[in-house]
C-alpha cells in the first residue's frame, strides 16, 4: 500500500526523492528554518571553534525521522568551511570500512554517520580513540605475524544522527561534546518551509493552502515537502494556477491523510487498540501483529507523532488511547475508563 511507506514514510524513496531533498536543503544556519535553540547554540560553538582554529566538538543529533538531522550536519560543515563525508551505521560493517573513511579526512573535516546506533560493536569501540585522541590502532596480519599499527588522525568532527538515542552505549554517547535534541516543527515553521520549497519548485501556493498543508505534515519538514509535491500534481492536473486550501483538502483526502496528519496506518493502529483491546493498555508487539507492521516501524515512524499530539500514552503495561484520540475518531470515550 503506497500510503504506508510512501507519502508519510520518514525515509526518502529512491534516487529522485533524494535529489529533491538535496535541492531543498538550506546551506547556512540563517537559511535553516526552525530549531531556534539548536541554531543559536551551534552559532556560538562554530564561532568559538573558528576563532581558536580548531575542529568543532563532536555532535550528536537525535530525534524522530525527517526533522533535518542530515541537513543540519551539512549546514554545520558549510558554516565551518570544511568538507563532509556521509555514511550510515549499517554501511560501516567492519573496522576496515571505518579506517577507509577516516583516512580521507583532512583537518577540521566532518564525518557524518546516520543511524549511528546501528554501528557494529567492534567499529564503535575503534571510534573511541579516534574521537577522543585522534588515532586508531589496527591489527595487521594474522596469527604469529599479526602486529598492531598506530594511525594518527587529523582533528575532525564526528556528527552522529539517531532516532534511538537510548540505544547508544554510554561510552560512545559520552564522547560527544555537543548533544542536541531535534523537536517537531511548529505550524508557522512548517508554513515557512512550504513557501520556501514552493518557490524552489516554481509553484504558486496561497496562504491558506500552505497553512492547510502544514496542519497535515506531522510537524515534519520531510513530510511537508513530500505532500507539497503530491498536491502540486493534483493542482496541475486540475488546471489550477495556484495551490489553495480546497485542492490541498481534496488531494490529501484522496491520499487518506486527515486534518491532523493521520494516515491509514495511524487510524488502523488506534482503532485496533480501541475495538479489540478497549483502548489499552496493549503491548507494542501485539499492536504490530494485529496491523501487520514491524514493531520498529511503529516505534520510529508512527508512535512518536501520536505521543506528541496526545493521541496515545505509554505506561509500564503498554500503550493507551487517550480521550483526545477517541474524540478525533468520532468515538465516544468509555465511561468505565474515566
UniProtKB/Swiss-Prot annotation:
Skewed-composition ranges (Basic and acidic residues): 1-14
Pfam family, one: RuvB_C
Annotated stretches, region: Head domain (RuvB-H): 259-338
Binding positions (DNA): 314, 319
Residue positions binding ATP: 24-25, 66, 69-71, 132-134, 175, 185, 222
Methyltransferase is among the record's keywords: no
Matches recorded under SUPFAM superfamilies: P-loop containing nucleoside triphosphate hydrolases, Winged helix' DNA-binding domain
HAMAP family, per database record: DNA_HJ_migration_RuvB
Family: Belongs to the RuvB family.
Protein name, UniProt field: Holliday junction branch migration complex subunit RuvB
Organism: Limosilactobacillus reuteri (strain DSM 20016)
Gene this chain is encoded by: ruvB
Amino acid at each position: 500500500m503506497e500510503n504506508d511507506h510512501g507519502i508519510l514514510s520518514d525515509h526518502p524513496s529512491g534516487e529522485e526523492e533524494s535529489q529533491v531533498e538535496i535541492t531543498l536543503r538550506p546551506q547556512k544556519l540563517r537559511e535553516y528554518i526552525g530549531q531556534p535553540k539548536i541554531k543559536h547554540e551551534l552559532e556560538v560553538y562554530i564561532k568559538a571553534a573558528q576563532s581558536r582554529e580548531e575542529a568543532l566538538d563532536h555532535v550528536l543529533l537525535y530525534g524522530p525521522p525527517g526533522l533535518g538531522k542530515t541537513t543540519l550536519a551539512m549546514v554545520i560543515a558549510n558554516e565551518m568551511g570544511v568538507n563532509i563525508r556521509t555514511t550510515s551505521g549499517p554501511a560501516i560493517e567492519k573496522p576496515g570500512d571505518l579506517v577507509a573513511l577516516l583516512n580521507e579526512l583532512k583537518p577540521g573535516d566532518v564525518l557524518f554517520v546516520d543511524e549511528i546506533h546501528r554501528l557494529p560493536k567492534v567499529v564503535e569501540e575503534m571510534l573511541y580513540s579516534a574521537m577522543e585522541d585522534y588515532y586508531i590502532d589496527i591489527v595487521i596480519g594474522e596469527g604469529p605475524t599479526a602486529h598492531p599499527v598506530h594511525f594518527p588522525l587529523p582533528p575532525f568532527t564526528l556528527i552522529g544522527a539517531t532516532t534511538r538515542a537510548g540505544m547508544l552505549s554510554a561510552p560512545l554517547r559520552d564522547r560527544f561534546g555537543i548533544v542536541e535534541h531535534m523537536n517537531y516543527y511548529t505550524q508557522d515553521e512548517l508554513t515557512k518551509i512550504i513557501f520556501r520549497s514552493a518557490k524552489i519548485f516554481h509553484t504558486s501556493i496561497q496562504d491558506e493552502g500552505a497553512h492547510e498543508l502544514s496542519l497535515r505534515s506531522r510537524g515534519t519538514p520531510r513530510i511537508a515537502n513530500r505532500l507539497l509535491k503530491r498536491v502540486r500534481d493534483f493542482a496541475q492536473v486540475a488546471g489550477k494556477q495556484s495551490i489553495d486550501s480546497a485542492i490541498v483538502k481534496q488531494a490529501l483526502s484522496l491520499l487518506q491523510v486527515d486534518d491532523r496528519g493521520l494516515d491509514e496506518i495511524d487510524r488502523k493502529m488506534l482503532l485496533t487498540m480501541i475495538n479489540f483491546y478497549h483502548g489499552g493498555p496493549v503491548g507494542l508487539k501485539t499492536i504490530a501483529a494485529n496491523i501487520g507492521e514491524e514493531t520498529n516501524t511503529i516505534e520510529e515512524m508512527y508512535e512518536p507523532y501520536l505521543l506528541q499530539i496526545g493521541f496515545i500514552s505509554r505506561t509500564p503495561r503498554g500503550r493507551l488511547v487517550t480521550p483526545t484520540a477517541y474524540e478525533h475518531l468520532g468515538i465516544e470515550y468509555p465511561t468505565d475508563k474515566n
